[in-house]
Amino acid sequence: LTGNRYVAIGTDKFLLIYFEGKLHDITPLKATLTSATIATTNGSPTCTITKSAHNLAVGDIVQLDSVTLPGGTGYQNADFEDKNFQVITVPTSSTFTITQSSNASGTVSTGGSLSLKPYEPVGPRAQTYGYGWGVAGYGDGNWGEAATASEVSLEPGLWSLDNFGEVLIATIANGKTFTWNGGAASALNNRASTTTTNFETNSNPTASRITLVSPTTRHLIHLATETTIANTATQD
């Protein structure tokens, strides 16, 4: 054991490790999307990225990789390479926009090549109430009117965090479970994952409310989870 003291912090966007006064991003990633292209507009910091079936939503975080920009944008590959961007708009299922820190100096319709590493989405920043179909009693109010009932709430993005010795167990509320090995070599350069060596969770339930480690038997317990593993529709 190295004796390092790590603090895990889960937010609505990131999973972080606090160590010696610094925050280290260990947020798990979804599958990499390759062969995306980029478009820019002269005088605007908005960049449009095209990738079919990207399945990204507004607010998602995506890291860009293997960036080769088309000529004429005024940007350098390094302005995008290994950088995180938030999805600003999603015009279509094949396009989304991000914002650079400076304006492009040229208009390029689309071109270049880059890979996308989407962060695992966690959830909204704050709890909100749900208004709409299915809220309040059936037949209450007039057709088309929004319900004013407050008994339905939409939860913020939450994490369930526990440890199995040196290994962090991190579960997104109603989502997947990931692990991060604090005892591994160069641990702070590694991300939480479902395939962490010797602590894999890729065969675990994919939708659980909470996970905890039994202090007596050292079993990992999933609560409010799926009755059929890998079928989120069976979460009970």
What residues fall within each predicted segment?
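Repetitive beta-strand solenoid architecture
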Residues: G3, T11, T50-S52, V58, ...
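Short beta-strand elements that form the blades of beta-propeller/WD-repeat-like
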Residues: N4-G10, L16, E166-T171, R218-T228
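Beta-propeller domains
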Residues: R5-K30, F178-A184, N231-D236
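Elongated alpha-helical scaffolds
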Residues: G10, S153-T177
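Beta-hairpin (beta-strand-turn-beta-strand) motif
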Residues: D12, V122-P124, G132, A173-N174, ...
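Hydrophobic or amphipathic alpha-helical targeting/insertion segments
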Residues: L16, H24-D25, Q86, E166-W180, ...
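Small/polar beta-strand repeat architecture
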Residues: D25-L158, S186-N190, N198-S203
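Active-site-adjacent structural elements in enzyme catalytic domains
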Residues: N163-F164, A173, A184-N189, T197-A224
